[in-house]
Amino acid sequence: FQLNGYAPFAWEAPHYQSSPLAIKAVPQYFKTTYQRVVYYTSDNPQTLNASTPGHDFSVGQFFPYIIQKDYYNQRIIPENLGNVEYNICNIDPSSCLTYTAQDILTNATYAQVVRDGFASFFFHPFWLEPEIGTPGYADFQTIINGITALGFTWVDASTAQ
């Protein structure tokens, strides 16, 4: 990255999922993460299967503001609005849910009640590919314009305090 002029400043686990021990290792390399964190009831969960007696739990946590230090010793820039999802069961049988641009904007409206809060979302760039047949570009514009209209200020995440 650095050879091409990029300076990585934060870590985001793929789809926010990694083991508790991996999460604990990240701050050695990246003090900051940019994500909705998944927390576990154990540093070494034996099973997350709900039908197993005594199973461990994992839960994703949305924060409306920066967390300077959490249980895993990471600084967290929050992704708290979610991400657009289209029902593309015909292409990918595991992608059968819908989370709309309006859902993102509804969450941004809710985020306004937090003083100095965030309106941060993730948008998969592949939704912009015309061959997928989704209104990705229009929805992306709707989200940007809607969040701007709500009065949020756009900042470079690497400068977020």
Residue ranges and their predicted role:
Residues 11, 75-79, 121, 147:
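Generic structural hydrophobic/aromatic packing signal, biased to beta-strands
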Residues 2-4, 27-51, 115-161:
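C-terminal domain-boundary segment and adjacent tail
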Residues 7-14, 87-98, 124-134:
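The substrate-binding groove and active-site-proximal loops of carbohydrate-active enzymes
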